[in-house]
């Protein structure tokens, strides 16, 4: 499918649930973002990374040849469909003041495989991170999550506050009225960006020219 055909299709955003709980607090926050996107004419799907252990990258370099991982798990399942989406929202619970171990291994491998395998699934596609916590650690987790998007040239979508919700269960999350509003504003802002990008492409504004990557090691 070429760029023109893609622009004629309805735009889609994939929301990734990085919690071991399929229908828990993180899911509740993502659903609020999803509903806001839907109201603005953007289709959405939710992808759960699952609760099975996810290995970190083992530096085998197989992704450079196959554009996927040597382990067949939810990472490869995600890579197979990621190119069909125009934007991404990654959700995670806060574990020990940072992102969950599952989503950390998941994103390490997803972006490394795409970058080294030449998949080009994420270039200039908007991304956002959503954090769910009982109490603290959300801002440190947000910083951690945004680093992935910064390396992949993914515009980072924000809300009117940092993208976090608080509560120990879905019912408590829904009582975080400000947090839920932040989720809705986030969805609206991502929809606005996607519509603006779509108009720009229709008007003939080209994507930025990509330069060959240059690597400079910190050796001095």
Predicted regions and their residues:
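Short, Lys/Arg-enriched N-terminal segments with co-localized hydrophobic residues
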Residues: 1-10
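Glycine-rich phosphate/pyrophosphate-binding loop and the adjoining helix
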Residues: 11, 39, 155-220
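N-terminal beta1-alpha1 ligand-phosphate binding loop
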Residues: 12-40
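A short beta-strand-loop structural module common to alpha/beta enzyme folds
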Residues: 42-52
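Cysteine-cluster motifs in flexible loop/terminal segments that predominantly coordinate metals
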Residues: 52-82, 215-219
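Helix-loop-strand module that forms the ligand-binding subsite of alpha/beta enzymes
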Residues: 70-161
């Amino acid at each position: 499918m070429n760029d023109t055909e893609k622009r004629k299709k309805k735009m889609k955003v994939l929301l990734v649930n990085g919690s071991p709980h399929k229908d828990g607090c993180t899911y509740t926050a993502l659903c609020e973002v999803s509903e806001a996107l839907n109201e603005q004419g953007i289709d959405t799907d939710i992808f759960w990374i699952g609760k099975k252990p996810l290995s970190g990258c083992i530096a085998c370099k197989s992704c450079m040849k196959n554009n996927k991982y040597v382990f067949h798990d939810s990472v490869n399942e995600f890579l197979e469909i990621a190119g069909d989406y125009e934007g991404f929202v990654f959700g995670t619970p806060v574990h020990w003041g940072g992102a969950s171990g599952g989503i950390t291994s998941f994103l390490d491998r997803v972006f490394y495989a795409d970058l080294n395998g030449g998949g080009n699934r994420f270039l200039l596609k908007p991304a956002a991170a959503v954090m769910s916590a009982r109490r603290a650690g959300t801002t440190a987790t947000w910083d951690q999550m945004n680093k992935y998007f910064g390396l992949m040239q993914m515009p980072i979508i924000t809300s009117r506050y940092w993208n976090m919700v608080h509560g120990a269960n879905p019912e408590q999350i829904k009582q975080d009225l400000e947090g839920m509003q932040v989720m809705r504003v986030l969805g609206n802002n991502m929809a606005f960006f996607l519509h603006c990008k779509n108009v720009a492409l229709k008007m003939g504004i080209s994507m930025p020219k990509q330069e060959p990557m240059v690597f400079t090691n910190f050796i001095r």
